[in-house]
């Protein structure tokens, strides 16, 4: 819907004012959430990691404490795009909250990755094993997590 409206107006999908207008019209009760998420998606798409981090942290705090999917998505992005211990600790907090809300392969895998990046090999192993078990139970490919588990075991 938004993409269609932007295309009709000759925009390329980065007009935040046009996005807000469409959202206010069709989903007024979700305007703040969806506009903030849209801004994050623009930063992610343009790989503007300097501006992404503070906005992602604020977005997670304000909108995502009960949303396991968004929390895990942000935590995974922070894990992949940042190298600082402080950022990984914040991402781990999100990943663990996501696991608390809904324990599935992706959430366990993100937590395992973050524990590994933080050099907490004991918890990394626990969460990698949980990820593999959850993935296999759901019929999900777990090859990446199995590879991580081998790295964890080798690093111990």
Q: Which ranges hold each PLM region?
A:
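Oxidative protein folding and maturation machinery
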Residues: 1-156
């Amino acid at each position: 819907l938004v993409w269609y409206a932007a295309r009709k107006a000759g925009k390329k999908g980065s007009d935040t004012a046009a996005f807000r207008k469409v959202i206010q019209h069709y989903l007024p009760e979700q305007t703040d959430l969806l506009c903030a998420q849209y801004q994050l998606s623009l930063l992610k798409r343009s790989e503007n990691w300097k501006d992404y981090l503070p906005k992602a942290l604020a977005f997670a705090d304000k909108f995502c404490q009960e949303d396991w999917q968004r929390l895990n998505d942000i935590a995974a992005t922070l894990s992949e795009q940042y190298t600082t211990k402080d950022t990984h600790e914040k991402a781990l907090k999100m990943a663990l909250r996501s696991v608390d809300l809904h324990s599935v392969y992706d959430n366990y895998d993100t937590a395992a990755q973050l524990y590994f990046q933080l050099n907490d090999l004991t918890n990394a192993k626990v969460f990698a094993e949980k990820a593999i078990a959850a993935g296999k139970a759901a019929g999900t490919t777990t090859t990446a997590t199995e590879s991580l588990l081998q790295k964890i075991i080798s690093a111990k």
